[in-house]
Amino acid sequence: MALTLLIGGARSGKSSLAVDIGHRHHAAGIPVTYIATAPCVDSGDDADMADRIERHRMERPATWATIEEELDLIGALSSVDDGLAIIDCLTLWTSNLMWRELGDDEIRTLATAAAAGAAGRSEPTVAITNEVGLGVHPETELGRRYRDV
């Protein structure tokens, strides 16, 4: 079925567009599952991220299913039986894997499997990711590795 990739800069409206797509599917009677990859943070640890997560939660109707999964994107995606799956976002998922000290090849293998799983669904999938390669050259080795993965 259809796999749609929403790509853009940080805070460029990608998640809002995905939610709009979800609303259209929901209005047509199609179930919507939102797969959130952002780690749940305490507002004391990162108030900005906690606020963003809460805003995203408020944008989604209670009738949508939500799966909060930082690492096992393939398992989360395979648990969505029917309807639209929205993955928000691949950028955070990748950084979550890097913080778990997975190697680049292992991350690429997981990304390939996740893409195949999304493309192989009989229902539509919308995946969100940030564009990280058109900006300035990252100053740190970790930043360059992140961009390259």
Task: Locate predicted features.
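Generic beta-sheet signal
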Residues: 2-6, 32, 83-89, 125-127
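Conserved P-loop
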Residues: 2-79
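Glycine-centered flexibility motif
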Residues: 8-9, 83, 133, 137
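Residues at secondary-structure transition points
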Residues: 12-13, 41-47, 51, 85, ...
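Conserved nucleotide-binding/hydrolysis micro-motifs of P-loop NTPases
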Residues: 39-42, 91-92, 132-134
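Helix-adjacent hinge/juxtasegments
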Residues: 58-107
